[in-house]
Amino acid sequence: AARSRSGVADGNATSAAACADGMLWRAKEISSNSALSETFDRAIFILNNLKKSSDVASFLNDKTLDKDNLPVFLDALSIVLRDMIAAKTDKNLIMSKHKEWEIETLSKGFSLDALSNILYLVNEERKKLSFYVGSTGVVENLLLGILEVKYKCQ
């Protein structure tokens, strides 16, 4: 993998910059997570492949969604969702330029209302983690919620 001047792999640097919302300290913290690019890709994969409620069970044992990795996954998912909203409104606002084509393609399967509601749901589930709600329950509720919102906001 190519490395940037900071010694961070280019894919991680790009993902970290997208996830950090302009905060350098946060970008450095995120870029030290070697699994960040994988987590970002996994968020896109899950949104692409979550089609029906029976699909939820197949993601419950995903290592990207386990207790230790879930906060980073929620960050990556938030960025993907924000970029999907940008793809529907103003493509110049997409932050994850390295995944622009995938994000634009993925966004076609969601309405703008659905994306906004799913982003809200992600933040609600993030709050539950801070109240020590079990990660499996958070993941299950999140994935089922995504399906429900996507269906209701067609």
Place the predicted regions along the sequence by residue.
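Charged, glycine-rich active-site and insertion segments that engage polyanionic ligands
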Residues: A1-A76, V80-Q154
